[in-house]
Design a protein with these regions (language model features):
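Short acidic, flexible loop segments centered on an aromatic residue
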Residues: 43-62, 103
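Residue-level detector of beta-strand face positions
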Residues: 2-3, 36, 51-53, 100-102
Length: 106
C-alpha cells in the first residue's frame, strides 16, 4: 500500500493483478486498485475531480480525468473516509499511475 497526505487529506492505494481478466498472450493485463481517501481535517471536504496519468513499460501513456470518482463526488466528513475500487488495463505487465484529486473545503 502507498499513502500520501496533503492538506489534511490522506490518500492510500492498494493494487491487485486480475489474472482472470488478463490475457498475457495478447498483451492484455488488468489491474484493480482500491483507493481510500481519509479526511484528517476539522471540516468536511468534497472530491470534485480526478486526474490520472497511466504509464506501462512499453512507454504507452494515457490520461484519465473527469468529475468525481466512479460516478460520485463524495463529501467526506472530518475523521471519516471514502473508499472505492476501480480498474486499469495495461498492454504490459508493469506500469504506474500518478495523479491528483481536486478537493473543496466545505
Amino acid at each position: 500500500m502507498v499513502s500520501k497526505i496533503s492538506e489534511g487529506v490522506e490518500v492510500s492505494i492498494e493494487t491487485f493483478y486480475q489474472k482472470d481478466y488478463s490475457n498475457p498472450l495478447q498483451n492484455e493485463y488488468m489491474f484493480a486498485y482500491r483507493i481510500t481517501i481519509e479526511n484528517h481535517n476539522s471540516f468536511p471536504v468534497k472530491l470534485l475531480r480526478r486526474y490520472w496519468e497511466v504509464f506501462d513499460s512499453n512507454s504507452e501513456h494515457r490520461i484519465v480525468e473527469g468529475e468525481g470518482v466512479v460516478g460520485v463526488q463524495p463529501l467526506i466528513m472530518p475523521g471519516k473516509h471514502y473508499q472505492y475500487v476501480s480498474g486499469c488495463h495495461l498492454k504490459s505487465e508493469l506500469g504506474k499511475m500518478q495523479g491528483y484529486y481536486t478537493m473543496e473545503n466545505i
